[in-house]
Design a protein with these regions (language model features):
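Outer membrane beta-barrel translocator domains of Type V secretion systems
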Residues: 1-182, 298, 303-305, 309-317
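Solvent-exposed flexible segments
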Residues: 141, 192-200
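Solvent-exposed, glycine/polar-rich loop segments of beta-barrel outer-membrane systems
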Residues: 64-71, 108-111, 146-165, 199-221, ...
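Secondary-structure transition into beta-strands, especially the periplasmic turns and strand N-termini
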Residues: 86-89, 126-134, 179-187, 232-243, ...
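Outer membrane beta-barrel transmembrane domains
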Residues: 119-123, 213-320
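Short, well-structured alpha-helical interface segments that form or flank functional binding sites
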Residues: 166, 184, 222, 226
Length: 320
């Protein structure tokens, strides 16, 4: 259960920070004149922004007692956004899926399966001057995770298997500003909070010899404080690079799970790192007047270096 939840936490951090900052770039009205000079598109009549992000993520996590979780996953995020009338902001909808293969070799544990998620976004610039835009954005998320859990016995004489199902929900809130520097670069600091909730359905591993390992239905809740800063630079008419640094601090968790093993009831707190650091970078290229592509990297590292995550993303976006 901890492995499934950790995977969701890292996916949330990877996609949120990487996508943030792009939501406001919907049409010419929401861009400064400097940015329009360098992007060479974003027609003011374009009210819609759509993008697709296929991605690959690899991470490892030290779980204690010499156990290490290793995971490889790939997925795709698809989103579309539209500017609301009368400068009321930008409303968007997104959906995505992910396939993951995870292993804990010391426990001879395999977890394979899919995730599906969707949500809404809202972005609003509430004050602008010549070089600075102040904004806020909100994101909601619902998701469903299904993992086939297989426990192989010592000596590989057999295995026990079951299916874990987790329903997730959450919301994120950010406030920040985008400021243009003398070299036409843009710096964007943001602060905010994440709420992440999960409900796992009960499941059972029936072992050889009749031992029954039953996991009860469980609820988990996390609240994180988030701070990021992104620096974007236009190099020539079509190229732009971006680098982002961030930190995620867990300020609240309600994450106790219960296991019934034969006649024994065991309870344990879901142990996760309290502090995460995020490093991201990317390069974008304008294909046409109304479309661009970009390549991005996202690294996540936890306090005490117990978690190391690397994600690589390709992004295709168009305005219409």
């Amino acid at each position: 259960v901890r492995n499934v939840n950790l995977s969701r936490i890292l996916r949330e951090a990877t996609t949120q920070v990487f996508v943030s900052g792009k939501e406001g770039e919907v049409n010419g009205k929401s861009l400064s004149q400097l940015e329009q000079l360098h992007t060479n598109h974003r027609d003011e009549n374009s009210q819609n922004h759509t993008f697709v992000i296929p991605y690959y993520q690899n991470f490892s996590a030290d779980l204690g007692n010499d156990a290490k979780l290793k995971s490889n996953s790939s997925g795709m995020l698809i989103a579309t956004q539209r500017e609301l009338p009368n400068d009321y902001g930008v409303l968007g909808i997104y959906t995505g899926f992910e396939n993951a293969e995870q292993k804990v070799n010391a426990q001879r544990l395999d977890l394979d399966g899919n995730s599906y998620y969707a949500g809404l976004t809202y972005n609003h610039s509430f004050y602008e001057d010549d070089l600075t835009t102040y904004f806020m954005n909100l994101t909601t998320k619902l998701d469903y995770i299904e993992r086939d859990v297989t426990k192989t016995y010592l000596g590989y004489i057999g295995s026990a298997s079951s299916t874990a199902k987790v329903f997730g929900y959450g919301a994120n809130a950010r406030v920040g500003l985008s400021h243009y520097l003398k070299n036409d670069a843009k710096i964007t600091p943001q602060i905010g909070f994440n709420y992440l909730g999960m409900h796992s359905k009960p499941f059972t591993l029936n072992h050889l010899g009749g031992t029954r390992e039953h996991y009860y239905s469980q609820n988990f809740n996390f609240i994180d404080a988030v701070a990021t800063i992104k620096y974007e630079t236009p190099w020539i008419n079509r190229f732009k690079t971006a680098v982002a640094l961030g930190t995620i601090i867990n300020v609240y968790k309600d994450a106790e799970g219960t296991l019934h093993l034969d006649n024994n009831f065991l309870s344990s707190e879901l142990d996760i790192a309290r502090l995460y650091g995020v490093v991201q970078g990317g390069i974008s290229y304008d294909l046409t007047k109304d479309s661009d592509i970009s390549l991005g990297y996202s690294g996540i590292f936890s306090s005490a270096n117990t978690i190391r995550s690397h994600a690589f993303m390709f992004r295709y976006a168009w305005w219409w």
